Regions:
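A conserved beta-strand-loop-helix scaffold within acyl/acetyltransferase catalytic domains
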Residues: 3-71, 124-258
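Non-catalytic accessory segments adjacent to catalytic cores
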Residues: 99-142
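Aromatic (often tryptophan-rich) hydrophobic motifs at membrane interfaces
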Residues: 54, 106, 218-321
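Short, high-confidence coil segments that cap the C-terminus of an alpha-helix
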Residues: 44-46, 114-118, 277-279
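Soluble or luminal CAZymes and related metallo-dependent hydrolases
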Residues: 96, 100-104, 202-205, 265
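A short, internal acetyl-CoA/4′-phosphopantetheine-binding micro-motif in the GNAT/acyltransferase core
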Residues: 80-95, 151-152, 250-259
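Active-site/acyl-donor-binding loops of N-acyltransferases
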Residues: 2, 65-66, 126, 134-156, ...
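Conserved acyl-donor/pantetheine-binding loop and adjacent beta-alpha core of acyl/acetyltransferases
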Residues: 66-84
Length: 331
């Protein structure tokens, strides 16, 4: 039986939160970044493509559009590691399964034509069918994230840390550093901005995101201080997903960058995670920067491949870069 795919673009006001979030929850490509309360914080005017076969929704794709003058691009927002296409659970023979994926993706790609000048998304690791994008001259590039499984004992997890990590933890303990958890993200957001890791817009986006996540009880902040709580050594923002804790962001006070505070904080997050129901791993989110990638590996984490899919107009990419550096308003 052939599919009759009808793909419709819906604005944010046309999307029902309960239906959307239930679809994302049930999708094999599930990730918290695609939930409506997350997208509302990081890109309030998001839209989505809905792929129907009759009355059944086969797939959805959240779209985060930005524009400058008459040019448009679709890119992942700040604080969002992955997005992409989210399918409903598909049953049946394997050849039929791939036929459905191909047909739906062709319909989505047809809809994207003419709607944007640049496309750049990281797709969730569980999305593994990229061929239709290659056929349409998109580039598909493998990236790495790192997951630290926490299903073994704490002593076994600790034994797999590199010597540098264990030395950092010992150093922090000798200084009698303390772990503080509180609800405010302001201290971390301000430190990130002071170190020029993020700009003002990303600061506001992070604060808005934390308000939404706090309402859903799916986040926590961790700060490392001295025993008098007079100095903040570092801070971290963590998102609680179905089976993972996502290491969303961290920053270190430059005065204490050799204190071992970050490794000490991560070790405390691991201990906290082991006492949380359903949590199976820490998601470090990954980085293609050599020094950061090396640090994540030092905790004994495993590499997880995901794919960046993009189509670029090089002239417009340069224009976007100039706009970002000049702090031009991009809506």
């Amino acid at each position: 039986m052939s599919l009759q795919i009808n793909t419709i673009l819906k604005s944010r006001t046309e999307i029902n939160d309960l239906e959307w979030n239930q679809f994302i929850d049930d999708s094999p490509q599930y990730i918290i970044y695609a939930k409506s309360f997350y997208l509302d914080a990081v890109h309030p005017n998001w839209k989505a493509l809905f792929c129907y076969n009759g009355d059944q929704i086969l797939a959805v794709m959240p779209l985060c559009e930005k524009s400058l003058f008459c040019f448009k691009w679709i890119t992942k927002p700040s604080w969002t590691q992955y997005l992409g296409v989210f399918f409903c659970p598909l049953q049946g023979k394997r050849h039929r399964y791939y036929y459905t994926l191909k047909t739906v993706l062709h319909s989505i790609l047809d809809q994207l034509k003419g709607k944007m000048h640049i496309f750049n998304y990281n797709f969730v690791p569980s999305f593994q069918y990229h061929i239709p994008f290659l056929w349409q001259n998109y580039s598909v590039t493998p990236y790495h994230s790192y997951h630290l499984d926490i299903d073994s004992s704490l002593s076994e997890i600790y034994s797999n840390f590199s010597t540098s990590v264990t030395n950092h933890i010992k150093k922090a303990n000798k200084q009698q550093l303390l772990i503080i958890e509180n609800e405010s993200i302001d201290g971390l957001a301000n430190l990130l901005q002071a170190k020029n890791i993020i700009h003002k817009g990303e600061n506001l986006s992070l604060i808005r995101l934390w308000e939404n996540l706090s309402k859903e009880a799916c986040c926590f902040n961790m700060y490392v201080t001295d025993h008098n709580q007079s100095n903040m050594y570092c801070g971290g923002a963590f998102v609680i997903d179905k089976e993972s804790i996502i290491f969303l962001a961290s920053a270190t006070n430059p005065k204490f960058k050799k204190s071992g505070a970050v490794s000490f904080m991560v070790w405390n997050v691991i201990q906290k995670a082991q006492n949380m129901k359903n949590i199976k791993y820490i998601d470090f989110e990954g980085s293609m920067i050599a020094g950061i990638e090396n640090y994540f590996r030092a905790f004994g984490s495993r590499a997880v491949v995901y794919y960046n899919i993009q189509k670029k107009n090089h002239l417009l990419s340069s224009l976007k870069f100039i706009a970002d550096k000049s702090n031009l308003r991009i809506i």
